[in-house]
Amino acid sequence: VYKRQPEEIEKIVKAQRIAERAFSRLLRDIKPGQTEKHVAALLEYYMAEYGSDGKSFDTIAASGVNSASPHAVPTDKKLENGDFLTLDFGATYDGYHSDMTRTIAIGKVTDDMKKMYDAVLFANLDAMKAIRADISGKVADSVARSTLDAWGFGKYFGHGLGHGVGLEIHEAPSASPSSQYTLKEGMILTVEPGAYISGKYGVRTEDMVVVTNDGCRNLTNTTKDLIIID
């Protein structure tokens, strides 16, 4: 159940590639002084231009203090030097959705910001190493959580690790502390650990994987190195 046929995975990958092309184009256009609303609208426009049938969900563009809210709605806040900017977005192709998140930096980052970024990155990588057929969604989530704990950010991770993606943007299975699912070959799952310090900033790094018998295949091709917009 919730296993994807190869042709379904192909459509999800097509949606994902559209989103990634739009993101790489957006990176050339982002500059301080633009509003979150402007950035979100630009990303949605580029996805449409590259063949998306419509956005997968309302694009999140959350900068500075707003990045500390996992479900932030774009505002008129302007991007400033020293901000983190979290972009969570997806395209659709023939009814199938994609989902990815990258947190980037506007101008220079502090050592504390870099540490949070690295903690979330390693939580993402460690969870992806653990994901394979027949482990539970609960275990996958706990791997990311223990990595964040080790870095001192565990208490700032206030949501589940991930969810299925398909004809809906949120589907089974789930990976969270309360997940009842066992992962099976062919399931698609997001891997999206985050850390959010209220009143300061937050980071989330999200990839989409397909579960295999001996691991998982990442459907996301975009770098996870910290991108800094100068």
Regions found by a protein language model. Name each.
Residues 3-230:
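Active-site neighborhoods and metal-handling regions in enzymes and metal-associated proteins
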